[in-house]
Each structure stands twice: as structure tokens, then as C-alpha cells.
């Protein structure tokens, strides 16, 4: 197993750099052939000659490691391997068609300016260019990331802008700003590339090789024990898999989730998620406790009062986080002076063990510190501090077997404190 960790800003998957992705028109041909049962009819529908269609199927079969179509009688039928690829292709077509419908509404017409559908003009070069321009913020940085010349990246990006018929960029060559339409297409490009990655990974799984990728976004509560325990269990089952564990702000991780840069986000759930393309699943309820370093003056008390807490110094998460909001509701911080704000467990541990500061935190986050006797829980019940912990995914996410097994490992890793 290869384990990667970092922050959400470095979540760019190298898959788009490493793979020779299939031709999107060839995938449309495969999907149409399975749907109508005839390669000739499918070729006419995607405007490919019969000889070219036959060559396209040979090339696709080579790319995906085996036959995708078989001829029986007068028709063609998809193999099991072929259906894996077709399933992902249909998800790609749904994404592209949904985007095209949005474009049509903005243009108040039923087709993009150049008179053809985005579906028929879209290429992998367009996807890569827009995906990486969106991430890097400039044509030059995107070109370096892709290992291409800057003019070729610019050409692909400007070409898709013309096909769509909406302005995708503002600003100059050195630093480009994506318009809302540009952001939307960059997200589409990233998700389509993700589906292509998943098609390859599922075919590999079909062949018994579980060497795919799983990228996990983590919020504070999940980073210490829940996700690590699940990752260890998963790596024992799939030693060839690459697993990335990323942290970052909630907003940054949500954006990475929406664009397919991470597969699942684990941590405290928000009451109402503002992103329509995402969904939450509750796994368990967690409670907060008041914690100090070993030997704190309040640690030997059998009972604490709110006055004791009000007269103490605190290390707290930044304002706007769920834990800080609960602290303000349950304890109040109107008169607190000299508060230290940090989201770093390492910094928090160092401060508490060397001072008389207090903090409010989940016991699950400091499991190892409690076991080592570095910190201790103070006798003050925070009634009403329960909060749901779970996972957030894209609403239409179709996980690979590796990714689905992580969800099972995650539920197993949820042990009582």
C-alpha cells in the first residue's frame, strides 16, 4: 500500500498525468453499440466509418485489457468487462448532458454557438486543459503540471470556450480568472476524468488487481483514530492500493469533494449542507468534554462550576467551527481574555501539557494522549454537546470496490470511547 497525506490544496490526482485516456468518441460508440445491438448503426450515430469503428473497438479493448463487445448472430453484446466501461461512460454522458442543458438555458437556445453538441465535440485534451487551468489558475502553471506547451493548453481551453459559446475566462495570460461558467466546466472536466479513472480501476478489480486509489478528506475528530484504524484495515486487505489522507478546512475539503479530488469526507456533519450535489450519512453521535494537562489545578476537583470555567484560560478552535459554536452556547466566551485559537492537535497537546489552559474537544481526538496520561478529562458535564459524526460524499457517487470497502472499514472502526 502507498499511503499519502497532506492538505486539501495538494489533492490533485496524478492519474490525469499518467494515463492514456480513451477517446471519448470511441466510448460513445461503445455505449451506442451496446444500446442498439449493432456496431454499424452505432457508427452512423457518432459519425464514424465502419472500418474506423472496428479499429476503435480494438483500441478500446486493448486499453481496458480485454474484449468489450462480442458478436452473437446478427448483433453485438457487451461482455462483463464492457458493461463496466459502459456504466462509467453513461455516467460521463449524463454529466456532459446536464452541463449542456445549463448552457442552453443561459444562451436561451437549444444548442451551443457552433451548431453541434458539446457531447460530440468534447475531447480529453479539453478536459485536461480546463481541469488543470482551474486548479493552477494560469495557462503556464497548467502547462507545467500537464507536461505540455503553454500554447497547446491555451488552444484547447479556448477551443472548448468556443464550442460551449460562453465566456470561460477573464484576465490576462499570466493569471486567468475563471468565470462562473468556467468554474462549472472545470468541475465537469474534473468529474469526467474521475469517472475515466474509476473505469480503469473497476476493470482492474474485475481482473483481481486491487491497486486503485482512494482519497479521504478528514476533519479534526476523524483524523486521530477513526480514519487511521479504517485505513490500516483496508491496507491489510488491499496492500497494493494507494490511499491518500488529506486535511484542510471544511469549505476547502467540500470543494475538493465536489470536483472529485477527494472521494469521501469524514468528520463532524453540518446541520444543513448547502451544496446540492452532496449528501451526508450519520455514523454515530459524539460528545465534547473539558480537557486539561496532567496536574492542572482543576484536575483534582470532584466538581466544577461555570465560574471555574469562566476564570480559566482556553485553547479553542477558530470561530465559526461547530466545536467553537458549541463552546459559546454551553460555556460562553463573552468575557474570555487571551484565548489561543488553533485547529492543530499537535499544538493543542503542547500547550495543554505545558500550561494551565483548558480546551473543549472530543475524547476520540485525544485517545492516545489520555492513554499516555498526558491529558485528562475534567468533571464538568457538557449536556447538549452531542453532534453527529459521519461521512459526506457526492450524491451520485458510485464507489469502486476498494472505495466501498473503506466505508465498511470505517463503520467497523467506530468503537466506544
Pin down the residues of each PLM region.
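Short beta-strand-centered segments that line the small-molecule binding cleft or hinge
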Residues: 2, 121, 206, 251-288, ...
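Short helix-boundary/capping micro-motifs
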Residues: 33-47, 133-145
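A short LG(V/I)-centered, amphipathic sequence patch enriched
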Residues: 61-78, 161-178
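Secondary-structure junction motif
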Residues: 298-299, 312-333, 399-409, 417
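A late-sequence structural motif
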Residues: 376-417
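Central regulatory/effector-binding core of bacterial HTH transcription factors
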Residues: 136, 141-151, 155, 212-270
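Hydrophobic hinge/microswitch elements
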Residues: 249, 258-262, 268, 326-376
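Interdomain hinge and pocket-entrance segments immediately C-terminal to HTH DNA-binding domains
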Residues: 103-126, 206-223, 238-241, 287
